[in-house]
């Protein structure tokens, strides 16, 4: 467990484990007034920290760590791709495209290369965008999930919280 100053990024302490009793015992060394001055606590997506944080820092906002949000939505797309992939015969073009080009499907679309490469799956020289286009023609149901994933990534990285949460609530 690492406690760090949000503004300065200075490490306050590194506890030897993540158990609630260890965390509670450490922070109860600080006065209630000092703990009430804490404004923000950033956590991973483990729900186990939230109850203890509310007790230790009653006035603090609890913020989910950016990395873990990206990891969570990335895993969701990956699981969806695998579920769709399993509907096809292993030797089919759809299965091979979904299996072989998983990294392209997961990649931030703004970071796709413009360079061409030879695709053994499609047996032609194409760009990553063209490859994705071919995959979505083969497996149109993946396109909606991909588009949502890309929108969530974009709004999260651009810190457009309003749009990010609207997308989550709409879907």
Cite the ranges covered by each PLM segment.
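Short secondary-structure boundary/capping segments
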Residues: 56-60, 77-82
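Acidic/histidine-rich catalytic cores and adjacent linkers
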Residues: 6-10, 14-16, 21-25, 29-61, ...
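Gly/Thr-rich phosphate-binding beta-strand-loop-beta motif of the actin/hexokinase/Hsp70
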Residues: 1-3
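A charged helix-plus-loop insertion that forms the helical arch/lid used to bind
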Residues: 86
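RNase H-like two-metal-ion nuclease catalytic core shared by retroviral integrases
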Residues: 66-80
């Amino acid at each position: 467990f690492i406690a760090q100053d949000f503004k300065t990024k200075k490490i306050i302490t590194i506890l030897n484990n993540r158990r609630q009793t260890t965390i509670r015992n450490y922070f109860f060394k600080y006065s209630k007034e000092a703990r009430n001055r804490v404004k923000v606590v950033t956590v991973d997506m483990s729900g186990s920290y939230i109850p203890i944080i509310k007790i230790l820092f009653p006035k603090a906002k609890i913020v989910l760590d950016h990395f873990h949000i990206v990891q969570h939505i990335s895993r969701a797309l990956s699981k969806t791709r695998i579920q769709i992939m399993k509907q096809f015969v292993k030797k089919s073009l759809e299965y091979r495209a979904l299996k072989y080009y998983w990294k392209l499907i997961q990649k931030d679309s703004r970071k796709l290369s413009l360079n061409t490469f030879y695709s053994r799956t499609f047996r032609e020289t194409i760009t990553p965008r063209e490859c994705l286009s071919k995959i979505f023609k083969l497996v149109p149901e993946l396109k909606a999930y991909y588009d949502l994933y890309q929108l969530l990534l974009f709004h999260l990285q651009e810190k457009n919280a309003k749009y990010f949460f609207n997308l989550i609530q709409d879907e």
